[in-house]
A protein has these predicted regions:
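Extended basic (Lys/Arg/His-rich) segments that typically form rRNA-contacting surfaces
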Residues: 1-252
Length: 252
């Protein structure tokens, strides 16, 4: 298992060579710095402490400055521990870049969901409304919470109630990495991830067993003209049509 910190930039879409559209989220992954290594001998477990985004010393405190100097770096705005065997190969002060992952990897992305404020059960829990007519006063209220006979009026844990919606840590699992660019410092993952734009996210190897995913080849306009890319797409489509025609002839 391995992991890295980044920031959500937003969503866009890319096209594969065969013309398939894939919605992707762009994650800005600047180099992370290893600030500390936790070992079983000293701490009882193995983990790597990563720092992300520099902070001016005048905006930091002495403990944070001293901790960062052990890794020969500036104090960091965000510090996270990653419990991962593969990360133990990095030494203190080493940089962890976006090429830690590659296209075709399946990852989990953890972040803080968008805060929605105080919401009722209809919005927060998708609860049904009450009767809207015939003298009913129960339109958007919660409804029954407990019974006096069976559980003596005790409200069970997990009952849908109004309250804070969003603003909590959540994880989107099994997202495919579409592209990694270590030079520009970004990762494209398929689908959406939690949090607002510029929100901090943690990209980690998925914890669930998944099948091996074949990397997809997407159209890149860097250094080439649109006409050249369209010619490549046309050639691919022609090859697919030709192979289908051969299969049809053999079937006859």
């Amino acid at each position: 298992m391995k992991g890295i910190l980044g920031r959500k930039l937003g969503m866009t879409q890319v096209f594969t060579i065969d013309g398939t559209l894939i919605p992707v989220t762009v994650i800005d992954v600047k180099p992370n710095v290893v600030l500390q290594k936790k070992t079983k001998e000293t701490d009882g477990y193995e983990a790597v402490q990563l720092g992300y985004e520099d902070v001016k010393e005048q905006r930091s405190n002495k403990p944070a400055i001293g901790h960062a100097k052990k890794a020969n770096t500036a104090p960091k705005k965000y510090i996270k521990e990653i419990r991962a065997d593969e990360m133990m190969n990095f030494e203190v002060g080493a940089e962890v870049k976006a090429d830690l992952f590659k296209a075709g990897d399946v990852v989990d992305v953890q972040g803080t969901s968008k805060g929605k404020g105080y919401s009722g059960t209809i919005v927060r829990n998708n609860a049904a409304r009450g009767p809207m007519s015939h003298g009913s006063c129960h339109h958007r209220h919660i409804g029954s919470l407990a019974t006096n006979g069976r559980n003596n009026g005790v409200v069970n844990k997990g009952t849908a109630m109004p309250g804070q919606e969003g603003g909590y840590t959540t994880t989107n699992q099994n997202l495919q990495v579409i592209k990694v660019d270590a030079e520009e410092g970004y990762i494209l993952v398929k689908g959406n991830i939690p949090g607002p734009r510029k929100g901090l996210v943690v990209i980690k190897t998925t914890v669930k067993p998944v099948k091996e995913v074949t990397p997809v080849e997407i159209i890149s306009y860097a250094g080439t003209s649109v006409e050249e890319e369209l010619e490549k797409v046309a050639e691919t489509i022609d090859e697919e049509i030709a192979s289908e025609a051969v299969a049809t002839e053999e079937g006859k």
